[in-house]
A protein has these predicted regions:
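Active-site-adjacent loops and short helices of periplasmic peptidoglycan-processing enzymes
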Residues: 2-3, 7-149, 156-160
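Conserved active-site loop region of the serine DD-peptidase/beta-lactamase
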Residues: 161-170
Length: 170
């Protein structure tokens, strides 16, 4: 038959929220780079509220910087230089940049750990009940998890609440 070889999945109707198909949708798993959906969502909400400006310079700290030899996906902003928020946001969404994610997390939260707390607060607001964030990138870390169902809720929130920035995702 046409049985999909997928472990965890969900398909929802965006307009109604109706679940059309699902498989282990509430089962938590390590979300890897899907984590960056929440990182970018928080940045977008701060831009829309005026708390951040698109042209605001963000420092690429030594902690956030990709050394080039790493296995991570990066946008490769040189260490100790700056890039505007809008470029960092595009680097997170398009290139899955861990460096941009960490630099933005440090800028907004003061540290990546504090930013993860903000991510968890936002997850609660959206109704993500099987999700817990430990970092802004999705790098493997004990206790860092999400479910397909929760990520669908986050995708809905991005489409609904970040209309201005949503085209970057396509």
């Amino acid at each position: 038959g046409s049985e999909m070889c997928i472990r965890d999945s969900i398909l929802i109707d965006y307009d109604t929220g109706t679940v059309l198909a699902q498989k282990n949708a509430a089962q938590p798993f390590p979300p890897a780079s899907l984590t960056k959906m929440m990182t970018s969502y928080i940045i977008e909400q701060r831009l829309l509220s005026g708390a951040l400006k698109e042209n605001e310079p963000i420092l690429m700290t030594p902690e956030a910087w990709c050394k080039g030899s790493s296995e991570e996906s990066c946008m490769y902003v040189p260490v100790n230089t700056t890039a505007p928020v809008i470029d960092m946001l595009k680097g997170i969404i398009i290139q899955s940049g861990n460096d941009a994610s960490k630099a933005m997390a440090q800028h907004i939260g003061g540290s990546e750990t504090t930013f993860a707390d903000l991510m968890n607060e936002e997850a609660k607001k959206i109704g993500m009940t099987h999700t817990h964030f430990m970092n802004a990138t999705g790098m493997p870390q004990e206790g860092h998890q999400a479910s397909a169902e929760d990520l669908a809720k986050l995708a809905q929130a991005i489409i609904k609440n970040s209309k201005k920035y949503y085209p970057i995702y396509s």
